[in-house]
Design a protein with these regions (language model features):
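Glycine-rich, often proline-containing surface loops adjacent to acidic residues and nearby aromatics
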Residues: 25-45, 113-116
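Long, contiguous, structured domain-core segments that constitute the functional module of a protein
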Residues: 8-31
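Polybasic, proline/glycine-rich intrinsically disordered low-complexity segments
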Residues: 80-152
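Acidic, metal/cofactor-coordinating or nucleic-acid-engaging core segments within structured domains
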Residues: 12, 20, 49-84
Length: 152
């Protein structure tokens, strides 16, 4: 996706950058990094939204750090709220699905790192996935541009 359409990828690292710390030689850190591409068209304050996205990524990464949950493609994440995930809480986006980022898995000096992309989804889409009438993979196909769009 070109930079004219989205704010460049935001990435939250859960890998090892400077030295090997975990005992698994095949995996760098937790073995994945979270990415998110935010559609910039229609954003009132893009800089504020970028800071807010970084806070959301940090909160989501905390699930891994605190509970050991591994985010992989094909999952959904209900954020437990009915208000939007944008900075003003006005968006219909209340959760995320995961898919493999276009970059995929990379080899680092400290092991493999899979880039897992988060795509913002609406409450009704989360409900469809909870009720198993739609899968995250099916929704990712519908949202094939991979952008989190607060205006959809």
């Amino acid at each position: 996706v070109g930079s004219e359409m989205c704010i460049r990828d935001r990435t939250y690292g859960l890998s090892e950058l400077y030295e090997k710390q975990n005992g698994n030689p095949e995996r760098s850190g937790y073995g994945f990094e979270l990415t998110l591409k935010l559609k910039k068209e229609g954003l009132e304050n893009p800089a504020l939204e970028v800071r807010h996205i970084c806070s959301l990524l940090q909160m989501i990464a905390g699930i891994t750090v605190n509970n050991g949950h591994q985010f992989t493609p094909g999952q959904f994440l209900a954020m437990g709220q009915q208000r939007g995930l944008d900075a003003a809480s006005k968006s219909a986006i209340t959760g995320f699905i995961t898919k493999e980022d276009d970059i995929g898995t990379v080899e680092s000096p400290f092991g493999k790192v899979q880039l897992v992309q988060l795509i913002g989804v609406k409450a009704e889409e989360i409900e469809q996935m909870k009720n198993k009438t739609m899968t995250p993979a099916q929704l990712a196909e519908i949202l094939k541009d991979g952008l989190t769009d607060y205006k959809r």
